[in-house]
Regions:
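Surface-exposed binding/hinge segments that line
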Residues: 96-100, 137-178
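Extracytoplasmic/peripheral linker and loop segments enriched in polar/acidic and small residues
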Residues: 385-394, 420-489, 512
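Gly/Pro-rich hinge or "lid" segments in bacterial periplasmic/extracellular proteins
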Residues: 83-86, 169-219, 223, 339
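Ligand-site clamp/hinge motif
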Residues: 212-257
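N-terminal lobe/hinge region of extracytoplasmic solute-binding protein
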Residues: 49-98, 190, 501
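Periplasmic-binding protein-like
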Residues: 283-324, 368-369, 469-477
Length: 512
């Protein structure tokens, strides 16, 4: 059952500016068409800023979203997603499932690494083996890769896994050269992307320069610089003064001011990130009771959070699977119902109310969410004590077995597939099962779901997984974040990514 991916779709999407991803840049340009149809000059450099520094430039090491706008422009994966989360070819041009556990890949020819060497099957095998050895990418059933010739490989799985292709879109699955040197690679990365590293000053800025031998054609802008600016209000100010062209993570209360400025623009995209609350299912206290966990969800008015704190830049979550993800299903959960919350508490033996503790970090939005939750839960008899501590402290305490009640957290479904959520957060064996959810029936249903192809059986298993999530309520999805980027009105061609891996190869900023 051969599945060749049509390249014409990519070409159309790039031309219309609605996505497309990776490639199609053509020759370097000095001018573009302006709003009046006349050619205008473009700047040699695009400067963007974000709040957090990078820990490494090595894309294959598990990283947070903060690294993606740099790493995704230095590296390429085998497959990628466009802005609508439709899978597109990248360094692999075709795939074929020879059987349920055998995947054959055809690789793109004529691809150069930044050091001038050719990308081939040896590099792909090395990369897949590398990320499997690290064991942090939910590769799961990977059972090795064999080289058929320079541009064909065969990947074996230990068991069927319909979600395996989505794993190959991860930034962490970007192809690196077989001569990879882990000790040096974090500071001197070598990829196949449209930009290569020019200069890096840790904690200050990172500058990339155009890679003229990029397989998709040279990027339109010569230089791309990311500045680290921790203070959110300063990022807005730098955009307003023209010191930067693009600002990430602008404060929600700055958005209306930016929208009113004719020299600036707000760009938005749906997101794979869900802001959520984890509930300790193994607690000896009240939250160990599923009726109490359901009562907590029924007490939360999620729409109020979106409207009052996010100024509408978010979508209420009916579960913890992003709406753009594969195998998302609209599903009735424990919706806002204060009277039902009181009834559930009484049913659990807590008609006089309870005291719970919520862990959160000091992020401004999280702090505000915690305060809203405190007010809403109080209305049904839940007295919420807020404890502010950094995320690493919370995670370390959980791993050490510390008892807790509730924790504000988030999960970004980077593969664009619901499997990433089930596998990553809800299995009893999941590294990130911070809710300490243990349900053997859920585990068994997941194992069958993960290895069952499309059809009625898989759909029935998926329904069971959703049923268990609602019945047991180990995690409450609050809202899906909208990606919001502020930019000069002279910016064109930036492709936003639902996981934050924004692509700049077709982006330009016009001059005055």
């Amino acid at each position: 059952m051969k599945k060749a991916i049509a390249m014409c779709l990519i070409a159309c999407m790039v031309m219309t500016g609605c996505g497309g991803s990776k490639g199609g840049a053509g020759e370097p340009q000095e001018t573009v068409a302006g709003s009046d149809g006349q050619n205008v000059k473009i700047k040699d450099e695009i400067i963007f800023c974000q709040g957090n520094d990078l820990t490494t430039l090595d894309a294959t090491i598990g990283q947070q979203e903060r690294a993606y706008s740099i790493s995704n422009n230095i590296f390429d994966p085998l497959f990628t997603y466009d802005s609508d989360m439709k899978m597109q070819p990248c360094l692999a041009t075709e795939y074929e499932w020879a059987d349920d556990t055998t995947l054959k890949l055809t690789l793109r020819e004529g691809v150069k690494f930044h050091d001038g060497s050719d990308m081939n099957a040896e590099d792909v095998k090395f990369t897949l083996d590398l990320i499997d050895q690290r064991g942090a990418l939910f590769v799961g059933n990977y059972d090795g890769c064999t080289i058929d010739d320079d541009y064909h490989v065969t990947v074996k799985l230990k068991a069927p896994n319909p979600a395996f292709l989505s794993i190959l879109t991860l930034p962490q699955a970007s192809v690196v050269p077989a001569e990879y040197d882990e000790a040096a690679f974090g500071a001197n990365p070598i990829g196949t992307g449209p930009y290569k590293l020019k200069e890096a000053v840790e904690g200050d800025y990172y500058t990339l320069e155009r890679f003229d031998d990029y397989w998709g054609g040279p990027a339109k802008t010569k230089l791309l610089t990311m500045k680290i600016v921790p203070e959110a209000s300063q990022r807005t100010m730098m955009l307003e003064t023209g010191e930067v062209d693009v600002a990430y993570e602008v404060p929600n209360n700055d958005i209306s001011r930016i929208q009113e400025n004719k020299d600036l623009q707000i760009l938005t995209s749906p997101s794979m990130k869900i802001i959520l609350m984890e509930l300790n299912c193994s607690s000896d206290g009240p939250v160990g009771n599923p009726d109490v966990r359901k009562a907590v969800e029924c007490a939360i008015n999620k729409q109020t959070i979106v409207d009052s704190l996010l100024y509408g830049f978010g979508t209420v979550s009916d579960n913890i699977i992003p709406q753009s993800a594969q195998d998302y299903r609209e599903y009735e959960t424990n919706g806002y119902d204060p009277e039902k919350a009181k009834s559930l508490l009484a049913q659990a033996g807590y008609s006089d109310g309870i005291q719970l503790t919520l862990w959160t970090n000091s992020n401004q939005t999280n702090t505000e969410i915690a305060q809203v939750l405190q007010s809403q839960l109080a209305e049904v008899g839940i007295n919420l004590n807020i404890v502010t501590q950094d995320d690493n402290t919370s995670f370390s305490l959980i791993e050490a077995g510390e008892d807790f009640d509730l924790m504000l957290d988030f999960w970004q479904t980077n593969t664009g597939h619901a499997d990433y959520v089930f596998n990553g957060m809800l299995l009893s064996t999941s590294v990130n099962n911070f809710s300490r959810y243990y349900n053997p029936e859920f585990d068994e249903a997941y194992v069958k779901y993960a290895s069952t192809g499309e059809g009625e059986e898989r759909e029935a298993l998926l329904k069971q997984l959703y049923d268990d999530m609602v019945t047991d309520t180990p995690i409450i999805g609050l809202y899906s974040e909208t990606k919001v980027i502020a930019a000069t009105s002279k910016l064109q061609g930036l492709m936003l990514s639902q996981i934050g891996a924004h692509e700049y190869q077709n982006a330009v900023v016009t001059e005055d």
